[in-house]
Amino acid sequence: MIIDADYITEDGKPIIRIFKKEKGEFKVEYDRTFRPYIYALLKDDSAIDEVKKITAERHGKIVRITEVEKVQKKFLGRPIEVWKLYLEHPQDVPAIREKIREHPAVVDIFEYDIPFAKRYLIDKGLTPMEGNEELTFLAVDIETLYHEGEEFGKGPIIMISYADEEGAKVITWKSIDLPYVEVVSSEREMIKRLVKVIREKDPDVIITYNGDNFDFPYLLKRAEKLGIKLPLGRDNSEPKMQRMGDSLAVEIKGRIHFDLFPVIRRTINLPTYTLEAVYEAIFGKSKEKVYAHEIAEAWETGKGLERVAKYSMEDAKVTFELGKEFFPMEAQLARLVGQPVWDVSRSSTGNLVEWFLLRKAYERNELAPNKPDEREYERRLRESYEGGYVKEPEKGLWEGIVSLDFRSLYPSIIITHNVSPDTLNRENCKEYDVAPQVGHRFCKDFPGFIPSLLGNLLEERQKIKKRMKESKDPVEKKLLDYRQRAIKILANSYYGYYGYAKARWYCKECAESVTAWGRQYIDLVRRELESRGFKVLYIDTDGLYATIPGAKHEEIKEKALKFVEYINSKLPGLLELEYEGFYARGFFVTKKKYALIDEEGKIVTRGLEIVRRDWSEIAKETQAKVLEAILKHGNVDEAVKIVKEVTEKLSKYEIPPEKLVIYEQITRPLSEYKAIGPHVAVAKRLAAKGVKVKPGMVIGYIVLRGDGPISKRAIAIEEFDPKKHKYDAEYYIENQVLPAVERILRAFGYRKEDLKYQKTKQVGLGAWLKF
């Protein structure tokens, strides 16, 4: 099983290294024969002798083309003859490529920006993570001492925790009497002990949570200050930091550094990404949070160190559990796109699609288009096109709602209509599909590059799902599930990739044709439904909600199922409408904002944001009760009464302060904030009192009654004293409770002023409801 690949230089020549796990043993394979190359398209082949003479300089050494070879390729499906230009060293490519491109005889150069080791994996058909080797995992986490204003890495590391299948341990340099704590003499010895642990346990995968931007950069900084090395790589090298967009990325040679943070950010949508919040979201278990100022206080006073050690140990344990949960999926994505987990776990879906396409292009002898230069990128960003069809929702409370949607609408359109850059407006074509409204023509004489790949992916996914149903082995079932989910992620990213401004196979005409066909098919479904007595309540891109006013639930379900069967007989190719589900009651506020309740009493919401972290508990609770009154009891007047009661209790200071706390996360160093919001103001006041405030910390505050801006009246929850302080009732009514429910109740004709507690009685609008 290939874990990773890179190259080293020996006597000026590159040597590919393949890091592998074979029969339980780690090994490195070397290849000294692979050479870097690029392709050049010439105006006239006779100019090749001139091109061969082009030289450049790198670190005082002359860079030259060592060999040339004329090759037959395809470019967007059309035959093309190009020259393959070999160079001595991968770093020669960036040194000489512009000189080659600028030569008068050169039309353009291609595939000059594919990293050497990745190029090797593609050309040799090697796939990381293929095989049944059992990898070993170790999670690592650090705790540091930090005071506001200090530069990164100034304060010592006070604890290092690690966890694997055998359990979790903590290394520290202050005396703590706990069975899982190992005490050493100094920070220096603690870091050296970590190195020893990693070398002894020799894990294939090191799991961290934000290790790219915190744990490893901090460890490297402290090791440097203490004059010690951090040889964590299997080749005894230190972790290597590199820039990746706005972030850092840390590589450990011979091991996979699996940082959960970018993976979880890409995979799940949460209001906050603290380790505690993620653990609760994934496993439904809570984990105690010990705040930075508490850690600092415990370390400096010696009181409460056991609690900090337990917290540190749990950090490593939780990171290990999360790592084991998320790693298999990333391993399957790595297998699918043919690049190492280290890269895949830090990639956007657009980049995953691109690596997959680069590999398949090589297999099919296709020359990959170039990435856009700055000017072309800016031009693409300015381009726009019409998206999916969204129908404004029908207002009111509705009963007996069916949900129908297309299965993989955009991938199905791409395959059915052969939507691809190489089939677009193709000359000498016998059969075309013409996109509605936009008029782009796609040749049907041959399968397009991307539609054929997408078709293979969807076919493979169906086979895997069939095997899952047949399999009785739970382990095999789980692995197959990871595989089919990885395919789904990739398949669903192709439409977005066509419109991704940095894409090699960018195709605005393809993207707008896909959405045009999407609008046509969903509108066809709408018209056919309405002709059969259904009322369509809401449409969004690939799905819709409908009912038959006055009909019984069973009749609506039966007619919907028959309709799905009928419409699928009319739809072309892979297009298929599915009966998604049935809801007893529901309402639609605006586009992408609705709430429904199924027949089991489960409430489903979209876009109503009852989990945002900067909403207080009272706002979330009120919204939940309002939804329950409307959906479970079908009573909007009851919902209005709930809101009035809450606003009355707030006005009379009858709501407990713990329900008023607003949480917001510090996302960067305090000195970098230009706009001072309430959470930043509170954080700055805490820092002035010696509390360690760092990016990622969540600040909880309550807004007090008084004059002046909110930022001056916000107080940390720890400092709130109900005997001394009064919360700002008007602020919580106007900025928390009413915004949480107003958009819901506006859909039933209520205005903001109708929802507040008033001494005079309001007339209800319940008669306005539709049943």
From Swiss-Prot:
Keyword DNA-binding on entry: yes
Keyword DNA-binding in record: yes
Reactions mediated catalytically: DNA(n) + a 2'-deoxyribonucleoside 5'-triphosphate = DNA(n+1) + diphosphate
Enzyme class: transferase
InterPro entries in the record: DNA-dir_DNA_pol_B, DNA-dir_DNA_pol_B_CS, DNA-dir_DNA_pol_B_exonuc, DNA-dir_DNA_pol_B_multi_dom, DNA/RNA_pol_sf, DNA_pol_B_thumb, DNA_pol_palm_dom_sf, DNA_pol_type-B
Source organism superkingdom: Archaea
Biological processes, Gene Ontology terms: DNA-templated DNA replication
Keywords, sorted A to Z: DNA replication, DNA-binding, DNA-directed DNA polymerase, Nucleotidyltransferase, Transferase
Pfam hit, one: DNA_pol_B
Entry EC no(s): 2.7.7.7
GO molecular function list: DNA binding; DNA-directed DNA polymerase activity; nucleotide binding
Protein family (similarity comment): Belongs to the DNA polymerase type-B family.
Protein name as annotated: DNA polymerase 1
UniProt source species: Pyrococcus abyssi (strain GE5 / Orsay)
